[in-house]
């Protein structure tokens, strides 16, 4: 019974923060470094070669490694930094050996007492403060939190100010302001102009509410894309959650303008949706003996796409479960019941996908 009760406490902490189970490798004279990571043996099952599926087909094994460090400069001022890297384990040792390997996070900053923290580097955009509420599925999910896409996912060149508990005056009231620096890359998909975003959230006794917004200039290359016009990109999202008594419920609604990447597989053209409307719902329950079932629904619809009109980008029901042997070892299955029509005008995959994984994390 003791083991069951411990799992009921540990597992939610692991879900909220990937570094909750980190191994402390140095702690001396006000300097601390924690190492964290995981190895995931993962396989997707779908029809054929997975080209018409939600997520693909075959071996998807990967590993991640990161560290978090902090140094106590004085009684009020703390310096900190974090780095995280992804290693694909489904590559050969030949020409594709480095495919998919990438830096996920790399930033450093300062925190001063109740005034807040300020950091710069590659970090999460502030709109993910809302989208993170529903990015909780065993394998899938987070479908609208694209990386290198303005403010909704991990992105480079962001300066972020965060304040917790409103200067120490209101418990649970948090806000953030973020500046996104220009990233003009070779591809329009992962570029952006200068922008500013912000988020505000409040949590009380397991309930949470959040709103986030970001707007940025688009690069010349983005404005010249075949799909999606306009000089500004906008993204906003709201979220509600309940996280208490072993129950997790969350919902997001959000919209974007000239910001969500799309590709027409039939015409081989790409760009951005003029507008999207996004709905994400998640429900999970943590049993004391380690089982965590999950059900979810996600729909992202693009509006007014050139030559097409309205079209689904993502549309599925999810059923899955994770079983935690202990704080370090787990296994899961995640099933996507795809609701995309087979005649989708962008050629978005319509087949179902099942993921089966086993995880060691520290």
From Swiss-Prot:
Pfam families, sorted: Porin_1
Subcellular location: Cell outer membrane
Topology versus the membrane: Multi-pass membrane protein
Chief localisation class: membrane
UniProt keyword list: Cell outer membrane, Membrane, Signal
GO biological process: monoatomic ion transmembrane transport
Coiled coil region boundaries: none
Molecular function terms, GO-annotated: porin activity
Signal peptide limits: 1-22
CDD domains: gram_neg_porins
UniProt KW rRNA-binding keyword: no
GO annotations of cellular component type: cell outer membrane
Family: Belongs to the Gram-negative porin family.
Subunit structure: Homotrimer. Forms mixed heterotrimers with OmpC; other mixed heterotrimers are also probable.
Protein function: Forms pores that allow passive diffusion of small molecules across the outer membrane.
Protein name per UniProt: Outer membrane porin F
Phylogenetic placement of the source organism: Bacteria, Pseudomonadati, Pseudomonadota, Gammaproteobacteria, Enterobacterales
Gene designation: ompF
């Amino acid at each position: 019974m003791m083991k069951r009760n411990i799992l009921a406490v540990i597992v939610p902490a692991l879900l909220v923060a990937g570094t909750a189970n980190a191994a402390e490798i140095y702690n001396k004279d006000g300097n601390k470094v924690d190492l964290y990571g995981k190895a995931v043996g993962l396989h997707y099952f779908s029809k054929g070669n997975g080209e018409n599926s939600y997520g693909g087909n075959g071996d998807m094994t990967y590993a991640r490694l990161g560290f978090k460090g902090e140094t106590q400069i004085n009684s009020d001022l703390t310096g900190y930094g974090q780095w995280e890297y992804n290693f694909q384990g489904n590559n050969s040792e030949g020409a594709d050996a480095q495919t998919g390997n990438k830096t996920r996070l790399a930033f450093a900053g300062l925190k001063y007492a109740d005034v807040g923290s300020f950091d710069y580097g590659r970090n999460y955009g502030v709109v993910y403060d809302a989208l993170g509420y529903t990015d909780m599925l065993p394998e899938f999910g987070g479908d609208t939190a694209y990386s290198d896409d303005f403010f909704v996912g991990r992105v480079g060149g962001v300066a972020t100010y965060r304040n917790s508990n409103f200067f120490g005056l209101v418990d649970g009231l948090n806000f953030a302001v973020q500046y996104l620096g220009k990233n003009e890359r070779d591809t329009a998909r992962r570029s952006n102009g200068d922008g500013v975003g912000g988020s505000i959230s409040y949590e009380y006794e397991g309930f949470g509410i959040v709103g986030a917004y970001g707007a940025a200039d688009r690069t010349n290359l983005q404005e010249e894309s075949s799909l999606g016009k306009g000089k500004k990109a906008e993204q906003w999202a709201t979220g509600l959650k309940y996280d208490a008594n072993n129950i997790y419920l969350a919902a997001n609604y959000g919209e974007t303008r000239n910001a969500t990447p799309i590709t027409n597989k039939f015409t081989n053209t790409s760009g951005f949706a003029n507008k999207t409307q996004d709905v994400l719902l998640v429900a999970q329950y943590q049993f004391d003996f380690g089982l965590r079932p999950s059900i979810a629904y996600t729909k992202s619809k693009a509006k007014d796409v050139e030559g097409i009109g309205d079209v689904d980008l993502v549309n599925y029901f999810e059923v899955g479960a994770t079983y935690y042997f202990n704080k370090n070892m787990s296994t899961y299955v995640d099933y996507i019941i795809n609701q995309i029509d087979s005649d989708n005008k962008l050629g978005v995959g319509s087949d179902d996908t099942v993921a089966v994984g086993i995880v060691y994390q520290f």
